[in-house]
Amino acid sequence: MPSYIDGQLAGAWGQGARLYASGPWAQGLPSQGYQLALNPAQLYRTCIGAVRRELAARGLDFPEAPAEARDAFLREVEEGRVDCGGFSSAVFFETLLANTVEGFFSDPSYGGNRDMAGWRMIGFPGAYAAYLQLYTHHGMRFDREPTAMGDAAARRHPHDHPGGRAGEHRHG
């Protein structure tokens, strides 16, 4: 998941390209969505630093701590009880959870869903290019291995290239 999240934070979303960033910064309602003066990359940097400081202050080595202690600390972050420098740790937790779920179920080309594990878990077939013959067959089993966008492009089906064979390039 780190590769997926790092990619998102380095891109337009992480830099807040589509976020209104001119204030004023009043406390918003949950229905109003993201209401911080930080872009997502800044939120991650700020809150990860705050979480690390809080763990150090408690003498808690997160990876080595018992599962119960890790769960209890994550619950505190989720409930907004960890100070993130004036920002709610709940917003950070919500963002981190959403990015983790996105990465787990995204196409592997985005850096998450290694070996299509998320898709295999739920039985999602992935990015097959041609469902035309199947879309009216409701309730039909579809027992194929998942395929990613990159896999579909590499297969080069004949129906994608009229007059040619799979894998054959035609130059005019």
Label the predicted regions:
Residues 1-172:
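Mature-region segments of soluble proteins
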